[in-house]
Amino acid sequence: PNEDCGEIEKFTRDFNYPAESCIKSLADLERLQIKTYFFSNVCAAYTRECYEAVGGFESLAIFNEDMVFAANAMKKGYKIAYAAEAKVFHSHNYNALQQLHRNFDLGVSQAEHPEIFEAVSSTGEGKKLVRLNCAYLKKKKKLYLIPKLFVHSGCKFIGYKLGKMHRKLPESLIMKLTMNKAYWAQRNFKNATKGINPHSGYGISSDERK
């Protein structure tokens, strides 16, 4: 974590990036669940062979493109190596509302990839993080931060659940909940221009010209 990182976020970084190195594969799915695919492109390196075999990152992604890539790589027989000795300074100082926005996008990304995330549990890791973070704050004698932890965790959970059900929400509400507004604009444009050949006429389809 960065020097200005708060105690709650500091523990979250340590929780996600532990001190022990490991190698993960699909064989770990039952044991690790969602953590099997945990992979952050903030501090990652890819071999060209693997990147090209998987087909690179998806062209349009709201969030989680790194975990989607990791899951697809594992399905092709690759493994993920986590090197605990590698160092990258990275952390966030999000407020509760920003946590809601971020986790809304997380929920959307999982809903858009049921072939990857439907079979694994995410909420179990979330509950474990809150429980261990509480113990950490007690040990640090910073009990006054526990209410903040609960508020932030609640916002994460609400955002995540809303993201998972985003197809049932009106677009106006989605735009208030998302952190990545550009994604929705790009997706709408992609859907609106689907089937149009830009090299035909003035960018209209053959059916429209008829």
Positions of predicted regions on the chain:
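Conserved donor NDP-sugar-binding/catalytic core segment of glycosyltransferases
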Residues: P1-F11
